[in-house]
Amino acid sequence: MNAPPGSGDAAASALEAASQAEASEVEASEAEAASAVEAASAVGAGGAVQPAVAASVADRARAAELARELDEHAYRYYVLDSPTVSDAEYDRLMRELTALEEHHPELRTPDSPTQKVAGSYSTLFTPVEHLERLLSLDNVFDDDEFHLWAARAARETEVDGWLCELKIDGLAVDLVYEEGRLVRAATRGDGRTGEDITPNIRTLASVPTRLRGASVPELLEVRGEVFFPTEKFAELNASLVAGGGKPFANPRNAAAGSLRQKDPRVTATRPLDMIVHGLGAQRGFDAASQSAAYARFAEFGLPVSTHFEVLASVGDVLAFIHRWGRARHDVEHEIDGVVVKVDAFALQRRLGSTSKAPRWAVAFKYPPEEVTTKLRDIRVNVGRTGRVTPFGELEPVLVAGSTVGLATLHNVDEVGRKGVLIGDTVVLRKAGDVIPEIVGPVVDLRDGTERAFVMPTHCPECGTELVRPEGEVDIRCPNTDACPAQLRELIFHLASRNALDIDGLGYETAIALLEADRVGDIGDIFHLTPESFEGLRGFGQKKIDQILRGVEAARHRPLWRLLVGLSIRHVGPTAARALARELRSLDAIAAAPAEQLAAVEGVGPKIASAVVDWFADARHRDIVARIAAGGASLADAGAAEGPRPLDGVAVVITGTLDGWSRDSATEAVQGRGGKVTGSVSKKTAFVVVGADPGAAKYDKARSLGVPVLDEAGFAVLLERGADAARERAVAADAPAAPAAPDTSGGQGAPDVDSARRAQRAQRAQDDAPPG
């Protein structure tokens, strides 16, 4: 049997606005080899290859240079656990070399990085031979490349099931069990030889030292990925820096470094975990497919992922890939793509492998969320509450679809914990819509010119001496009355999409109004007139009308949005919605004692104290009075009425709803007394599922037996209430066990209900591979 391979090798609003310029062009560093890479974009995915031509001297030199670079980067990644380039840069170099070799086959040698399983084994541990070789995976990077790969596989054999699983970004490990007893654990190494880490693996709570059950195989070699939980990563680095140690660049390096400790007792202190996803040598183990093997692994007590499915069509596979691309941060470990495998072992054997990778599996790589770049400087930004936030000025770099030149460092303590110096090469992370963040330095690239950041002692905007309130991590400017930065940020925040969403009142408008003394605080916004803009450059009648219409609309926004716009410390959308839902008017909130506010679900003592303190300030009460005098509503409609139809009903919304934005759907629920939460729990009354729902939320609803509503059911919930909605909900009869593989080797691990399949059926018809 062929061995299946492993699955994977705020700040302030001004900073956010400046740091996320959308980029449509390719970076200059990548454009250098664009023509060669484009010609080979189908390599590894079944694409046609251009006719070979003789290699020039420059081509030969470039190929040799690329081979040397790739070998060095692989050594630093797999052996030293200390990479100096990002995964994205490594992939780019590999694709360039692959392209050159496809154009000029004479450049391809047996020892080329394109022909080898990446990695080597360290000399720090005893080398051991794997019973069966661990192969790498070919990569595809978009739908077209995946279609080409799938079509090639389907031409060679009739594929009746594609197993899709998350590609864990961790350290590949090989486990050997004899008569059910763990006898050896080794790293991947070069695929043939790894390093013996058995004592260290035994410290992982998730890895059984003896397999469960009476019918364990005589011999079982399994492959998997050891990972470091993302939520624990920052905590580890902080402790390392505090002790004078070297921080890890990312969770993958933390996993590798923790597992390769000479003293297993150190490994035992790290919260490592593992997922098994592959089969090597075996005797006495019977399974017809990958999914059936996973079911057996689970019976033996081996850790297997619940986040996989066996799907019938390429359309369904791509839907899985893109769904998890949106939900990649909903799992406990980092993922950088999805691995797709032909499920049946017989078909895997028929398709075979190259010297490097199986033909029956491929990794669909997501756009990189981590890259390396130079930290040019560290500066500070003053926010609307006076918080002074360090941020990094970077050499602009493309990450997650945006060109990023600025990134948050949160606070001065965080700069110290991360161990970053001005001039460092740093790892930059941008996850989805999250503000770009500097993860840590690449210490091995330091040349001695780097320097430490020194926090300023006075506000860079108004010159006031900065303070650090007792018990807080943030340093603040106490000049809340006159600091121009704070006033600017307060106005910009009030008008932002998360608050009153005032069309036309952006950052530049806020600056212009303040500098011309047309406004002095946020209360003045509701008293703007056409005369307020007289003499201001760039404000024509059309622009003025747009802003004034935006202010008029803001006067009638829901109460929670006004609460957010007031910039009360700690009061974000969640707490604001809870307070508005419970008390219904700003007067009631202002008059409520801290104990009453703290009793509101989702508020608590810290937020309650901040609200009481804010309204205790006479200047703030004057601002509220001026807002009211400007015609703004300080109460929600129906504030004097009794109970509402969805009082106490918790709803989770996932996917896209026709005719509803996420904000409008949320406000529809909250306006009827319900609340919308971000995660599914036993307290959730309904999960509303639109098109392309988040996999984790949907599966959690099924496992807990929470009623699921489609869009029509959501309409019933809003119009007729919870009881009527339950009658048309899709719900499990009883809470389901955690999703487990299908032992039949068929199409269902885990099951996908018929309504969800029907939504995708039409899309899948045009996507099915030939044959």
Swiss-Prot record:
One of its GO terms (cellular component) is cytosol. Zn(2+) binds at residues 459, 462, 477, 483. SMART domains: BRCT (SM00292), HhH1 (SM00278), LIGANc (SM00532). Residues 1-23, 731-742 have a biased composition (Low complexity). It comes from the Bacteria. It catalyses: NAD(+) + (deoxyribonucleotide)n-3'-hydroxyl + 5'-phospho-(deoxyribonucleotide)m = (deoxyribonucleotide)n+m + AMP + beta-nicotinamide D-nucleotide. Coiled coil: none annotated. The active site is at 167 (n6-amp-lysine intermediate). Residues 1-34, 728-771 are annotated as: Disordered. It is an enzyme of class 6 (ligase). GO terms for molecular function: DNA binding; DNA ligase (NAD+) activity; metal ion binding. NAD(+) binds at residues 87-91, 136-137, 165, 188, 225, 341, 365. Its cofactor is Mg(2+); Mn(2+). Its EC number is 6.5.1.2. Residues 641-731 form the BRCT domain. GO terms for biological process: DNA repair; DNA replication. Keywords: DNA damage, DNA repair, DNA replication, Ligase, Magnesium, Manganese, Metal-binding, NAD, Zinc. DNA ligase that catalyzes the formation of phosphodiester linkages between 5'-phosphoryl and 3'-hydroxyl groups in double-stranded DNA using NAD as a coenzyme and as the energy source for the reaction. It is essential for DNA replication and repair of damaged DNA. Belongs to the NAD-dependent DNA ligase family. LigA subfamily. HAMAP family: DNA_ligase_A. This is DNA ligase. It comes from Frankia alni (strain DSM 45986 / CECT 9034 / ACN14a). The lineage of its organism: Bacteria, Bacillati, Actinomycetota, Actinomycetes, Frankiales.
